[in-house]
Amino acid sequence: MTSSADSGRDAAWLDDFLALTLAGDAPPAEAGECAARAVRWRWLGDGLLRLEPADAAQRMQSVLVSAGVHGDETAPIELLSTLVRDIARGALPLRCRLLVALGNPGAMRAGERYLDDDLNRLFGGRHAQLAASREAPRAAQLEAAAALFFSTAGRARGARWHIDMHTAIRTSVFEQFALLPHTGEPPTRTMFEWLGEAQIAAVLLHTTKGSTFSHFTAQACGALACTLELGKVMPFGANDLSRFAPADAAVRRLVSGRRDAPRGALPRAFTVVDQITKQSDALELFVANDVPNFTPFARGTLLARDGDYRYAVRHEQERIVFPNPSVKPGLRAGLLVIETTRDTHAALA
């Protein structure tokens, strides 16, 4: 029988989940207890950790929180490691089944966005098309971990959540914003209210199925899923985490089952109307490197040229998000969105 002292020693690494992951180490045991035996934990592999209350109820929420799908997006990784520490110490009560995922440990250790291919473009089985990529087996592993985790989750609305935390390459008109995957259903008021509580200023609504982690969990696992963009890419240790306090607090309230959050304003909504796809390395993107995400452009403005391909603004005003001419040919070099706040809020399910 494992003693309380042995259990505490085995769980000491939970004080710095990030350090263990960056070192590429495994914990001394694969399962144990923490938080004075109030929480059970199981290490599921590199950067993967499941936590659940010792008295977990059958109808308890199941929440997946991920960060580091892009290895250089350090602030959310640090927030997530601190969340694990506080749960393990008993400083933050756990009132859900929680799966913690540091998405791309190899890229995190290298200090790079990715090693071979953008991991957040390889979900929904797309990894099978790039079998030689070092990101491909990780995408398959994350899919399997999420599917297994949610396979025993409740099916009521709001029983399954996935919060995938990122930071952006560029600054943004809205410093912190969210992206909701396309599911064929209207977005939920539950998600919009939670994003308002997190003081997320804007939400981008996808209109086609995608290959991101949050698309996979929404489509394949039935989760209320979102991608959070919480600021700008910075090196480990250089982040001012206080800038992310509202979003961090909202995640903590979600996993601790608290319902005492002040209701924030619903975020503004923007719907994707088109994208710029890189046809070749000859792509010219007429958007300067210092242009923030969500910058508006007027009808007729030429934004991209690539051989015979042109993209000019078709609506009275379109805003560009994630302009990036450095992506590989065939991938998205920018999203174009229009504001749909009134209609989106009216249609919330």
UniProtKB/Swiss-Prot annotation:
Catalytic activity: N-succinyl-L-glutamate + H2O = L-glutamate + succinate
Annotated residues for binding of Zn(2+): H70, E73, H166
Gene3D superfamilies: Zn peptidases
A Pfam entry, by short name: AstE_AspA_cat
Pathway field: Amino-acid degradation; L-arginine degradation via AST pathway; L-glutamate and succinate from L-arginine: step 5/5
Cofactor section: Zn(2+)
One of the GO BP terms on file: arginine catabolic process to succinate
Alphabetized UniProt keyword annotations: Arginine metabolism, Hydrolase, Metal-binding, Zinc
GO molecular function list: hydrolase activity, acting on ester bonds; succinylglutamate desuccinylase activity; zinc ion binding
Hydrolase recorded as keyword: yes
Active site (catalytic residues): E229
Domain of life assignment: Bacteria
Cofactor, free-text remark: Binds 1 zinc ion per subunit.
Record's function text: Transforms N(2)-succinylglutamate into succinate and glutamate.
Stated family: Belongs to the AspA/AstE family. Succinylglutamate desuccinylase subfamily.
PANTHER family tied to this protein: ASPARTOACYLASE, SUCCINYLGLUTAMATE DESUCCINYLASE
Name assigned to this protein: Succinylglutamate desuccinylase
Organism: Burkholderia mallei (strain ATCC 23344)
Taxonomic lineage from the root: Bacteria, Pseudomonadati, Pseudomonadota, Betaproteobacteria, Burkholderiales
Name of the gene: astE
